[in-house]
């Protein structure tokens, strides 16, 4: 029997057993107390910048809770999002995660940590290993343009990572160690202190993997012989570590101040083979990041909140040479004279890019008469880029200032019925592109307790980055390839529409949302004739091909997201499905015309499934077990083949041990990709997934907390304090 048929048969049996188990549960007598209810109703803050119960938020918000994170036991943020949210797709490589949300890529997704932007990229890809999965309290996902609140980048949506806080008087000590296949190591440590008005939380994380090779076959070009012994890995060996510190001082009941910072380093080890154009690598990739922040929260009265923040971040990307490397060099002052090489020796480091960003913000939430809530603020951002080998002149800068205001209105009518409106405007002033006004409007109509209808219209606005404007990079790959920026680029804009319905009753939650996103003047790299490039570059580099950033694409995405969740006694079930269709008007360089194509990476169908069981065997032992599945149809690309469809299933268990007043012992163990699916597509072609096949993991967490819970009065807006929206579980 073919492998695909065997896989399908096994999956049908698993689903049948799960349905039988669910039916047996339903046959038992039902009572109101049988349904699992949160002791604290879920609250969200990302969509509007103000705190709301999830069921009453005017904008559809997807939440991955702390309990879901613990049950799933994901090894990374990519693992968590792909396993628990079907709208996401990833395709990891050395340049990043290549994340997509509802068809649009990383450049259009804004990632926040406690409301602050994650900064730094390589090739437009954020380094998600900056985020320690063990330090996540919950994840809030808002889809569609959010530029009225967050500015550029938020055309596809916003992911807000809300981290854990030390809220208890006394001492907190936590260690979490996890080991898995391919020498996968995940280490997390935390030390928390809270005495009186002062608190400190220190976090350390370390991650390592030996990487893996799913195939040794390399795609070759032209008439070259196939390569069957390539040394390239599907995922390279890598290590990274980060240490962070957060200090908080409560001046009085009205004012709280904070300061914090992080230091991060990462290295990607690239094996070297014998085929010069394919698997010979003479340098590794290295990253050095740092951040510092300070600010505070002020409550002028019992209802209003003002926050002020100053943030600085640095992201440095460099080559670490592992073998003598002869780099082709040119000396412009001597005209067309060609100098064949410039040597780099082992252990030398060459800076590729050094990005630094400074942001200042002032935000306030004010209660107004007649059920209105005003959220307003001002921001300033300064970007500095140093890339001697990659931008014209070696450096580039950019600045953006913005003011925004949003008003929310609530009106209760009838029995348990609610109308919630939110409208906002953002005025952005960019140093290179002038002013732009972007609006957003959302409405939620609650019809009794179970029914909610939501609608949103919003515009997005994204200015070209300094890299897209000033890029100049030469790459040796079967000849010289020249990549150029374009100072004539226009900002990208979008219009986003969504309409959704929600039904929630007696442990059952069903949510269906349809959306349409139209993006104008998309920026992408296109091949141009050499004569269109600056003559001095053609003389200097003599490229075989020249590519330049241009506004050539208009894109549209349309789709439907469906989520079903049901909780009964100790059981929970979930099903997610995402249907997506995309098209773009793309420049065809070979025929010098526009053509209609699908957006790269699009999968028309994606889904996930989970069922979990939680049971306490007396005061000293509790078990949580879950089966999770994620599926994707074919991912389509214009070049280098399509990514294969797949389905991957996972078993995860957690075991809470002991009955100690101050110490928590938790063991995690599980099997990922239990059906052992591997995509062995040759290197150089697109993959559906990079999974190495069946893998195993085990982990131990020890948490010691000597203190008592204290009440936090600073329920602020989006800035730095989310304690009111988190649960009390460590």
Tell me what each language-model feature is.
Residues 431-436, 449-497, 516-550, 630-635, ...:
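Surface-exposed extracellular loop regions of Gram-negative outer-membrane beta-barrel proteins
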Residues 212-215, 520-521, 525-527, 655-730:
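C-terminal beta-signal and adjacent terminal beta-strands/loops
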Residues 77-80, 97-100, 112, 126-132, ...:
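N-terminal periplasmic accessory domains that precede
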Residues 357-363, 396, 402-404, 490, ...:
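Outer membrane beta-barrel strand-and-loop segments of large Gram-negative receptors
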Residues 116-143, 245:
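Short acidic/polar hinge/loop motifs at secondary-structure boundaries
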Residues 178, 194-285:
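Periplasmic-side early beta-strands and strand-to-turn transitions of outer-membrane beta-barrels
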Residues 370, 375, 411-416, 515-518, ...:
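Gram-negative outer-membrane beta-barrel transporters
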Residues 78-116:
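Extracytoplasmic beta-strand/coil segments of soluble accessory domains associated
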């Amino acid at each position: 029997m073919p492998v695909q048929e065997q896989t399908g048969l096994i999956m049908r049996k698993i689903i049948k057993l799960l349905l039988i188990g669910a039916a047996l549960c339903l046959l038992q007598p039902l009572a109101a107390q049988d349904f699992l209810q949160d002791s604290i109703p879920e609250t969200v803050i990302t969509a509007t910048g103000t705190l709301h119960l999830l069921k009453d938020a005017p904008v559809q918000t997807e939440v991955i809770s702390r309990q879901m994170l613990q049950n799933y036991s994901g090894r990374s943020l990519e693992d968590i999002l792909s396993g628990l949210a079907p709208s996401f797709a990833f395709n990891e490589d050395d340049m990043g995660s290549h994340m997509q949300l509802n068809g649009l890529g990383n450049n259009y997704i804004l990632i926040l940590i406690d409301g602050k932007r994650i900064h730094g990229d390589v090739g437009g890809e954020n380094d998600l290993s900056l985020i320690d999965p063990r330090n996540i309290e919950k994840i809030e996902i808002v889809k569609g343009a959010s530029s009225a609140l967050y500015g550029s980048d938020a055309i596809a949506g916003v992911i807000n990572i809300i981290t854990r806080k030390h809220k208890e008087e006394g001492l907190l000590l936590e260690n979490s160690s996890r080991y898995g296949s391919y020498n996968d190591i995940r280490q997390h440590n935390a030390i928390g202190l809270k005495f009186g008005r002062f608190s400190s939380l220190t976090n350390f994380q370390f991650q390592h993997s030996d990487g893996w090779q799913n195939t040794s076959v390399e795609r070759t070009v032209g008439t070259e012989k196939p390569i069957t012994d390539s040394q390239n890995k599907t995922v390279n060996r890598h290590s990274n570590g980060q240490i962070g510190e957060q200090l908080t001082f409560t001046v009085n009941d009205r004012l709280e101040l904070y300061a914090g910072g992080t230091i991060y380093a990462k290295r990607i080890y690239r094996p070297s083979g014998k085929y010069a154009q394919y698997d010979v690598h003479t340098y590794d990739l290295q990253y050095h990041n740092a951040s510092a922040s300070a600010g505070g929260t002020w409550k002028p009265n019992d209802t209003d909140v003002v926050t002020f923040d100053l943030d600085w971040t640095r992201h440095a990307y460099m080559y670490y040479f592992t073998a003598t490397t002869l780099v082709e060099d040119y000396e412009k002052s001597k005209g067309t004279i060609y100098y064949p090489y410039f040597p780099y020796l082992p252990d030398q480091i060459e800076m590729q890019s050094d990005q630094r960003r400074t942001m200042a913000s002032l935000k306030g939430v004010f209660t107004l008469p007649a059920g209105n809530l005003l959220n307003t603020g001002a921001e300033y951002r300064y970007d500095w880029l140093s890339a001697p080998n990659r931008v014209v002149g070696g450096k580039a800068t950019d600045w953006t200032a913005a003011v925004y205001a949003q008003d929310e209105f609530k009106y209760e009518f009838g029995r348990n019925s609610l109308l919630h409106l939110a409208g906002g405007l953002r005025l952005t002033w960019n140093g290179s592109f002038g002013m732009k006004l972007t609006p957003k409007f959302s409405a939620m109509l609650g019809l009794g307790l179970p029914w909610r209808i939501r609608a949103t219209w919003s515009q997005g606005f994204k200015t070209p980055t300094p890299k897209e404007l000033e890029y100049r990079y030469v790459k040796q790959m079967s000849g010289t390839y020249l990549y150029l920026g374009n100072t004539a680029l226009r900002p990208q804009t979008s219009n986003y529409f969504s309409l959704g319905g929600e039904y929630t009753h007696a442990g059952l939650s069903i949510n269906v949302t349809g959306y349409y996103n139209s993006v104008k003047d998309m920026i992408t790299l296109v091949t141009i004739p050499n004569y269109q490039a600056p003559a001095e570059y053609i003389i200097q580099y003599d490229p075989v091909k020249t590519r330049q950033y241009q506004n050539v694409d208009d894109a549209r995405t349309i789709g439907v997201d469906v989520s079903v969740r049901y909780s009964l006694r100790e059981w929970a079930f979930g099903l997610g499905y995402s249907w997506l269709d995309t098209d773009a008007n793309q420049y065809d360089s070979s025929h010098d015309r526009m053509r209609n194509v699908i957006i790269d990476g699009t999968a028309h169908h994606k889904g996930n499934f989970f069922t979990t069981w939680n049971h306490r065997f007396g005061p000293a032992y509790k078990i949580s077990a879950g089966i999770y599945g994620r599926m994707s149809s074919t991912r389509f690309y214009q070049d280098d083949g399509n990514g294969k469809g797949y389905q991957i299933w996972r078993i995860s268990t957690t075991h809470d041990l002991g009955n100690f007043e101050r110490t928590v012992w938790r063991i995690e163990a599980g099997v990922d990709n239990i059906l052992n699916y591997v995509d062995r597509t040759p290197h150089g072609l697109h993959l559906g997934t990079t999974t190495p096949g069946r893998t195993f993991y085990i982990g131990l967490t020890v948490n010691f907390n000597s203190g008592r819970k204290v009440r936090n009065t600073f329920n602020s807006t989006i800035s730095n304090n989310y304690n009111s929206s988190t649960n009390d579980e460590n």
